[in-house]
């Protein structure tokens, strides 16, 4: 849930595989993590679908804290530099310097941005709010919504919807 609600130029897909058999297909995702005997390998910028592309190894044998730090940096750098609706794989393909440049920014902090990227991610994580949970739990917000089909006994049902019973199941007629 760490990245839940993270707004990015395009949807993000992640996977974690517990071994090198790679059952979760982590190398076909925007961020893929594969367990090793010494820690975790971090793969980035993969893509499935119409234009499949294997993710590339960004860093290997990472401990958990370093892994999360690199993922945070990667996501924030992508969010800040990618074009609207641009997948990570296309972003990476268009990046001058390619994977070497990305490694230098994320792993080696060549631009001196690491602390700022991490701070921004922590801010996003710390201020995340599930809008739908707020709507469900706050009666004032709930007043803006109206019941449609599933009106309870004490609520006004929609008069335009007729229910029938067919084979013992309620159907909309």
Q: Where would I find each of the regions flagged by the language model?
A:
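Peripheral terminal and linker regions in Fe-S/redox and tRNA-modifying enzymes
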Residues: 1-173
């Amino acid at each position: 849930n760490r990245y839940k609600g993270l707004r990015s130029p395009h949807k993000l897909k992640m996977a974690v595989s517990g071994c090198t058999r790679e059952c979760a297909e982590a190398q076909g995702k925007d961020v893929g993590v594969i367990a090793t005997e010494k820690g975790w390998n971090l793969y980035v910028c993969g893509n499935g679908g119409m234009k499949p592309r294997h993710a590339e190894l960004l860093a290997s044998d990472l401990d958990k804290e370093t892994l999360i730090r690199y993922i945070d940096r990667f996501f924030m750098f992508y969010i800040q530099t990618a074009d609207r609706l641009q997948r990570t794989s296309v972003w990476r393909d268009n990046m001058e310097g390619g994977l070497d440049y990305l490694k230098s920014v994320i792993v080696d902090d060549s631009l001196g941005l690491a602390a700022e990227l991490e701070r921004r991610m922590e801010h996003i994580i710390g201020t995340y709010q599930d809008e739908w949970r707020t709507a469900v739990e706050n009666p004032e917000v709930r007043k803006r919504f109206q019941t449609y089909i599933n009106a309870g006994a004490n609520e006004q049902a929609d008069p335009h919807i007729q229910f029938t019973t067919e084979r013992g199941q309620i159907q909309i007629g």
